[in-house]
Amino acid sequence: AYRTAGPQGERAEALWRDQLTSYEQTYREEARELRRVLSGRLPENWVTALPRFKPDDKPMATRVASGKVLESLAPVIPELVGGAADLAPSTRTYLSGFGDFSRETPQGRNYHFGIREHGMGAILNGMMLYGGLRPYGATFLIFSDYMRPSVRLAALMGLPVIYVWTHDSIFVGEDGPTHEPIEQLMSLRLIPNLTVIRPADANETAAAWKVALEHRSGPTALVLSRQNLPNLSETVDRALEGVARGAYVLSESPLDRVDIILIATGSEVADALEAQKLLHKQRIGARVVSAPSWSLFDEQPLFYKLNVLPTHIIKRLAI
C-alpha cells in the first residue's frame, strides 16, 4: 500500500504543474502576482504606504498606531491576513473592508480564531508553512503565555509569523492585575530566534511593522501599549533606521558631554526624555537611547553598539 503513495503523488504533482502552466498562459498578470506571493517577496514600493505621524498629532496608543499601519498596508499587500483570539477590537487588528474568512467566503482576510491562543498560534504556523500568505495573530501580551509552545515552534522552524501583543504594561484599564504582564516581556526575549519589538510611539510602531514584514527567518512579536503615548519629534526621521538596528540614540545630551545614558523601551521612552530635561537643569548631561529590540541590537556590528553605548560611560540607567 505504501509503495503506491509515491506514484500517486507524482501524478498529482504533474497534474498540478499542467494546471499551473495553463493558468500562467491564460492569466499572465495574476500568475506573476501568484509567483511573487509564493516566493515571499513583498510588492514593489510597498514601504511608501507606511503612514508617517507628526509630533503635533494627538497622542495615541501604539496599538492604535498599529491599526492605522494595517489599514494602510492591507490594500497594497494582498497576502497580509490575520485576526485575533476574540480581541480584534481591543488589539486593533481587524482589516476593515476585507471581509471575514470562512468556508463560504475564502477570500476574506479576517480570521476569527476564538478564545484559544495556542490554537491561533498553531494555525498561524500552518498558514505560513503552506505558503502564499503572511499571517498575523493578536491577543493581549499577558495571554502570550497560552500560545508559547506555538511561538517556540515558529522560532524553531524559522517561520516569519507576526504576533501583535497589546496591553503591554500595568496601564490596562479596568481589568486589573490578572491582565498586567510582568514577567512576560523578559521571558519572550529569551526565546531564541523570536524578534521582540516594543516601540515607543506611532512612528516606531510603523518602523516595527516594516521590520516584521521584511524579516523572513523567524517570527516577530510587536509589543504594544493600551494607553496613549505622545508622538515624539525625535522619532520622525530616525525611527525607520533606528528600530531596524534594535537601539539607537534618540536624543543626545544637551551638554557638551555625556554623564549618563538613559535606556528605555516602549512607553517608558517618553519618561526618559522628560528625565533628560530634569537632569539638564542640574547640569547633568543625559543621552537617551531607545532600545525597542534587544535581539536586533545584539546583531549589529560592534562599532555601532559601542557608538550607541560607549564603554567609557559607565553610568547607565535602564527604565
Q: What residue ranges belong to the model's regions?
A:
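Thiamine diphosphate
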Residues: A1, A88-M186, E204-A207, E214-I319
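Conserved acidic/glycine
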Residues: A1-R116, D259-I261, T265-S267, L278, ...
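Structural signal for hydrophobic packing residues in well-ordered secondary-structure cores
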Residues: G6, L20, E24-Y27, L70-V81, ...
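Short alpha-helical segments and helix-capping/turn motifs at coil-helix boundaries
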Residues: R63-S72, A122, Y146-V151, A206-K210, ...
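Short coil/turn connectors at secondary-structure junctions
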Residues: V76-L80, T105-R109, Y130-R134, L156-I162, ...
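General beta-strand structural signal in soluble alpha/beta enzymes
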Residues: G83-A84, F113, Y136-G137, Y163-W165, ...
